[in-house]
């Protein structure tokens, strides 16, 4: 009996979790944060990834092919990677605020819109932001809702 109740509660919780999920298309950073991130990127990342984010023979581009690589994940996955593996010559040295700003710049450079709230500098806060390669189609309002 308890298992049935627990299973029922878990099934009911899934739609609630999906409804609370935000997309990068909802504006996961601010313009000002992306601007700070661009400066930090030029100082700490451009020598490997290029000033135009095109990458080199040895490093991947951070535009174009970058999007499908991260698509289907949540933003904490990208943020954790940037925070722990970059810059290559001194991984994890930039700190959470700088890494959040650089991630915001990467989103802007890839055409994702800015919002009114800064991209969080903790992984936990980013677990509900999905990295959708394509803008989700808005749900149509039903005739009754009008």
Segments predicted by a language model, with ranges:
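Positively charged n-region of N-terminal signal peptides that target proteins for export
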Residues: 1-4
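Hydrophobic h-region of N-terminal signal peptides that target proteins for export
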Residues: 9-18
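Electrostatic cytochrome c docking/interface patches
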Residues: 17-40
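Flexible coil segments in periplasmic/lumen-exposed cytochrome c-class electron-transfer proteins
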Residues: 21-22, 91-146
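Conserved beta-strand positions that form and line the central face of beta-propeller blades
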Residues: 27-28, 52, 61
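The canonical Cys-X-X-Cys-His
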Residues: 37, 41-52, 102, 106
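Extracytoplasmic electron-transfer domains, predominantly the class I c-type cytochrome c fold
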Residues: 56-57, 61-114
């Amino acid at each position: 009996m308890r298992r049935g109740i627990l299973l029922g509660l878990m099934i009911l919780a899934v739609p609630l979790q999906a409804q609370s999920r935000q997309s990068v298309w909802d504006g996961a950073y601010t313009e000002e944060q992306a601007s700070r991130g661009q400066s930090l990127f030029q100082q700490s990342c451009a020598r490997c990834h290029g000033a135009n984010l095109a990458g080199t023979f040895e490093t991947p581009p951070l535009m174009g092919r970058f999007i499908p690589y991260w698509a289907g994940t949540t933003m904490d996955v990208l943020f954790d990677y940037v925070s722990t593996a970059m810059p290559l010559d001194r991984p994890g040295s930039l700190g959470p605020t700088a890494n959040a700003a650089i991630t915001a710049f990467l989103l802007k450079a890839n055409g994702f819109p800015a919002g009114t709230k800064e991209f969080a500098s903790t992984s936990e806060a980013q677990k509900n932001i999905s990295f959708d390669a394509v803008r989700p189609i808005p749900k149509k309002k039903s005739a009754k809702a009008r």
